Structure formats: C-alpha cells, structure tokens
Amino acid sequence: MDVYKILTRQQWAEVVASGQFNGAAIDLVDGFIHLSTARQLIETVRRHFRSQVDLVIVGIDTERLGDGLRWEPSRGGDLFPHLYGSLPVTAATALIDLPMGPDGEHQFPPGPWH
C-alpha cells in the first residue's frame, strides 16, 4: 500500500542528496512525519499547502517503513499514517508534479486520490 507526502521540489532534491527525509518544520514540531492516504491527500493539500507552488507528491511504500509507521486519529477522527523516524528515499515509489492551475488551485493529475 502506498501513502503520500507533499514536498517542495527543493525538499525532494535534499531527500535525494541525503538519502532520507527527517521532516518538514511541522513534522519536527509534532515529532513525526505527516503522511496521507490517497483518499486524504486532496484535503491535506487544501488545508496545509494552499497557494504553495513547486510541489510534488511522493508515493511511499508502507512496507518499506518498518515499525515506525503508526495509524493515529487526526482530522475528523480519521486515521492518518504518521512516521516516527526518518523517511528513506528508498521507500519512494513515485514522484508526481502537483502544478498550480490558473484558478489558484492545485491541479491533481489522474491517480488514486480521485
């Protein structure tokens, strides 16, 4: 099963260079890396990445995350995947551009989130 992380293209370049992602500012404050399921992804982007450009969707294989992956209640009581520890670049299964449309909304390409 894949889960997803939204990153800037620059953050992804840093992940590739270092071999792992230790978290964005909010992840570091909360003590875990915030991830989303396909069903949760569009709302996550709307709430937390509105108007941010140069974003990518990183697909992540949950089987490669080990026991640091936990499913915990969050928005509306829905269970969200949280990763306690670093995200290894080797867990990535896909890198998908998330462009901004002329209406100021992110334009999700075809995928499991629709």
Protein language model annotation of sequence segments:
Residues 1-114:
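Conserved, structured core segments of small domains
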